[in-house]
């Protein structure tokens, strides 16, 4: 096992959209969990605009709040399967902007989780 994938770590995985952590890093996250690390996922957005075209195509079209609810349920289910904790900062997407207030939120997140 490589030094990177070892137990007793506290890891934060940042994800732009709700499903990115699974499709981009799911295997690594699973290996970290299997090795005994604790992983917390931080999604910047629900991917409600650019990552949800199939949801927007439904008839009748769902509201933005409904799209976010669906995406939240999907990310919670994926997190439960992986055995991680998760939160969504709901920064919105398209564009996803990180200004001073949001940077402060991220600093607080690091202080809280101590990765």
Task: Go through each PLM region and give its residues.
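Active-site rim/loop-helix segments in enzyme catalytic domains that contact anionic ligands
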Residues: 1-113
């Amino acid at each position: 096992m490589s030094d990177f994938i070892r137990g007793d770590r506290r890891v934060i995985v940042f994800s732009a959209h709700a499903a990115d952590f699974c499709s981009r890093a799911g295997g690594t996250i699973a290996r970290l969990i299997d090795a005994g690390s604790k992983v917390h996922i931080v999604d910047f957005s629900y991917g409600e605009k650019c990552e949800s075209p199939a949801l927007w195509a439904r008839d009748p079209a769902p509201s933005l709040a409904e799209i976010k609810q669906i995406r939240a349920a999907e990310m919670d289910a994926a997190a439960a399967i992986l055995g991680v904790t998760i939160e969504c900062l709901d920064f919105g997407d398209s564009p996803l902007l990180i200004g001073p207030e949001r940077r402060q939120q991220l600093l607080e997140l690091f202080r809280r989780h101590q990765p």
